[in-house]
Every structure is written in structure tokens, then in C-alpha cells.
Amino acid sequence: MRPMLMQETHRLFGGDSPALAPFMAAMEMIHTYSLVHDDLPAMDNDDYRRGRLTTWRVYGEDMGILAGDALLNYAFETAFQAFSLAPEEASSIGRALQVLGEKAGIRGMIGGQVIDVGKTGQAVEKEVLDTIYELKTGALIEASMMVGAILAGASEEEIKTVEKIASCVGLASRSR
């Protein structure tokens, strides 16, 4: 879903950047790493995801951690390939990398996971739950749509509007 949102937002702003494909792949890797880590015993301790045994259940907890770490690192290695595909777009690629790192990091998805883990076994108020969803789910959707807009040459005002819309999309996707 996230790469498609990135591509469609890019198209909406008239983009045709060759830098888009590495970012789409990177986004899917970041999302997958987050699921691998979320399933670990220290986090949600899930045995199954999408009807199949989780990574750590098949390969062990140590390999689950390393697989997630490898996916995150390879995601950024892949995104950096955009510089060689579209060197003339270095400024927008740099801005896209900044957004990707921020939304996947402590002010985004990881921050949401920190709150989630800290609330394990506790009753959680709706506002806190909304914050967790906004950060864990919404942040990567925001990044996807913002990166699509950035690489298409959208203005900062348009990017801020996309971020607001994407936040609503993220919250709606958790409500299903």
C-alpha cells in the first residue's frame, strides 16, 4: 500500500522522476522490518502474521533481529541509489531522505513503538491510542505520500498539505 501511495501522489503532482523506484522499494523494506521487529518476543511476541509463522518463530529471535536490522539498512542503501539515477535531483532526493528518516525514526514509527511497548498491559486512553496509531502507522503513510510529492517537485506548502491528508489516511487505515 505505501509504495502505491507514493507512486500515486508522485503522479498526482505530475512527477516522472527515476528517483521514485528506489524510494518505493525502500519504503516496503522499512515497513517489513518494522513488522519483523514488532513480532519479536520483546515487543508483541507474535507467533503468526498474515496466517504464517513470524520470522523469529521460523529462524529464531537472533535472526529476526538481524533480518529487521538488515532490511532497515538495505532500505536506506536502496534509497541512496536515487542519487545515481537522478543526480540533477540531488536536492529533492536529500529532502526525501530527510522525511523518510524522520518518519521512520524516533519522531515517527519508532516513537510510536516506544509508546506502545511502554503501555503494554495497561489500559490506554483513546488519545494515547490515537498517538500510537498516528506514529506507528500514519508516519510511514505520511512519508510515502510526502516523498512522492517531493520527488515530483511539489512546493513546501503542497507537501505540508499532503502530510495532513496522509495523516488522515493513516488513521483511517488503522480503523478497518
What is the predicted function of each stretch?
Residues 1-176:
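Mg2+-dependent prenyl diphosphate-binding active-site environment of isoprenoid biosynthetic enzymes
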